[in-house]
Amino acid sequence: MTDRTQPHTVQVHTTAGRFGDTAAGTNRYPDRGPSTSKVIAVITGLPIGGTLLLFAGLALAGTLLGLAVTTPLFILFSPVIVPAIIVVGLSVAGFLTSGACGLTGLSSFSWVMNYIRQTHGSVPEQLEMAKHRMADVAGYVGQKTKDVGQKTKEVGQEIQTKAQDSKRT
């Protein structure tokens, strides 16, 4: 303990700054330019991306043109089309709801069956366990019946002795 009388200090000397700069201010990595794989990616990506963007614009323009042409027809035939759309929409919603409820019921049934199988074992084991439980319950009921019969006999004897005592007095 006595050999540490003077405080110790730590000095940190940085040789590299942030982002790869050295202490002298020059970059550690010389400017080599983009790699060939990056150049190939840009060369192939730009035409493909441009083509897809062109197709998206054409699809939007076609949709707007079709909507502009068919809107007057929808307005003219709306007394027929609107109820038909409502009927078709409700039918589709009904089928989807029916399928969702059926799938939910099936998955719930599957979960319950897996839970029963994992928790309680196989069917023969369940039957054996049920037999043992029934035997235990039958033994318990038999013992209780004997106890109640004995208690009834004792109460009857007490009443008989009290009745005989009351006749004597």
From Swiss-Prot:
Query: What keyword terms does UniProt attach to this protein?
Result: Allergen, Lipid droplet, Membrane, Transmembrane, Transmembrane helix
Q: Which Pfam families match?
A: Oleosin (PF01277)
Q: Does the keyword Transmembrane helix apply?
A: yes
Q: Where is the composition biased (Basic and acidic residues)?
A: 146-156
> From what superkingdom does this record's organism come?
Eukaryota
* BP terms from Gene Ontology: lipid storage; response to freezing; seed oilbody biogenesis
TM region(s), chain numbering: 39-59, 73-93
The answer on whether this UniProt entry bears the keyword Cell membrane reads no
Cell location? Lipid droplet; Membrane
| Family of this protein | Belongs to the oleosin family.
The job of this chain, per UniProt, is described as: May have a structural role to stabilize the lipid body during desiccation of the seed by preventing coalescence of the oil. Probably interacts with both lipid and phospholipid moieties of lipid bodies. May also provide recognition signals for specific lipase anchorage in lipolysis during seedling growth.
Q: What's the protein called, per UniProt? A: Oleosin Ara h 10.0101
